[in-house]
């Protein structure tokens, strides 16, 4: 019986560790999805600009839900972030191609994270099954004999 109790404690500890890892993966998955969605929105905006001619008016966000009216004077180029605080000017087509690569990277990271999360969930299920088995064994050992 003491051996079963010790095994249950070990299983509970392992379960808590795996649950914490699963929570972190779920949070990472959410951040990756948000990042991918942001890149997708930028890509769609740039694709829309390809069809525009001349100057046109836009709203420029300045923070706290406030905007200024502005005009796009160069709809053939975009300045895109390339990481580490750097941005470069690229043609719309090159910008879209760059964004597609980044979206693909995000999608690969999302797929890997989802796979890791599935594995953790399977491990959690196995630990729960083992714990239930031990608890049933203990319950049978405590049955009242007539």
UniProtKB/Swiss-Prot annotation:
It comes from the Archaea. Keywords: Chaperone, Cytoplasm. GO terms for biological process: protein folding. One of its GO terms (cellular component) is cytoplasm. InterPro entries: PFD_alpha_archaea, Prefoldin, Prefoldin_subunit_alpha. GO terms for molecular function: unfolded protein binding. CDD domains: Prefoldin_alpha_GimC. Pfam families: Prefoldin. The keyword Signal does not apply. It is found in: Cytoplasm. The keyword Chaperone applies. Gene3D superfamilies: 1.10.287.370. Molecular chaperone capable of stabilizing a range of proteins. Seems to fulfill an ATP-independent, HSP70-like function in archaeal de novo protein folding. Heterohexamer of two alpha and four beta subunits. Belongs to the prefoldin subunit alpha family. This is Prefoldin subunit alpha 1. The gene is pfdA1.
